[in-house]
Amino acid sequence: MAAKKICRNEKLQLKGSLKKNGFDRWRLVTNAVSSVSGEEKTFFIEFYAVNPALSPKECVLGFKNRFNKSTEDFQYVLPGSETAKNFTSQTYVSPSFFMIKAGVLSASANQMNSYFPPEILSAKKSEYIISAKQEELPACILAHDYTSGAIKVTDEDLRAHPEYMGSSGTMSWNLKFSRSISFSSDYRAKDINWAVLGGKTDFSGTIIFNNEEYNVNPRNSFGYYDKNWGRDFSSPYFHLSSSNFTSEISGRLLDASVFAVQGEYKNKVSVLVSIEGKNIEFHANKLKKKQISFDCQEMNGTEDEGLKLHWSVSVHDRRYVIDIDIL
């Protein structure tokens, strides 16, 4: 079957100087139901490429600095001399790696981070967006309308490499997807870009999480697919998205509705909303007159719940008023 045309923004964007000073991230989110217990969980799969040209053959993490002094240098530190005051035991290492991040969101959160040398990443074939071959596990692939792969992180891995962070576990997936609602305009800036490739994405297939099978049905997958790339991540980071709405007026499920909020972009957020076929877009980098406020605060829940997060976003202009309030 002929490969489907891949949107330009979906492709790997790390070209030119971004090869040594840039990142590219694809994120997919879907609900799935356990075939054993019937429990529903929200799963995520992310593909990361960071500074791939800096160290193609070796995975280098920037989370852990490296010792850059000799034994002779170190002896001056022991007596607490003046030299010790200017002694720097570690030096910053620019990261260079490809990573698969996968797991579960919400109360039963689990995040597995699996790192690889950048050279395993392939992005030059027309039939897929990116592919990463592994020695012992199936290749992790992201194409225009499907994704498949597997990752495994052991307790031994985390003890040997605490800089990996995250949790131990296994996850494999084989998913097809179609995007029913997208937003054509993206947030574009010098250091970071954001594209909502599938604000409402319908997934189908299976996920095996820690040896338990979960089924993904397109009718209730409530999927999401977006992408970030550039020179630096947003900090602080703010993100909300959903395609699971019920009308308070009619009580019916709004199948053709979605919202996505992301920032901070110079103390602003982009708010993208589609209500039953009508797109309403407020972009942080556009000069359109609008007022936007957003916040995320910790709140005390019940004894069983513990601390809760209260998210709020409010945006309005001359035509629209949109309030998002999530507990």
Regions from the language model: what does each represent?
Residues 1-327:
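Structured soluble/peripheral alpha/beta segments that form catalytic or ligand/cofactor-binding pockets
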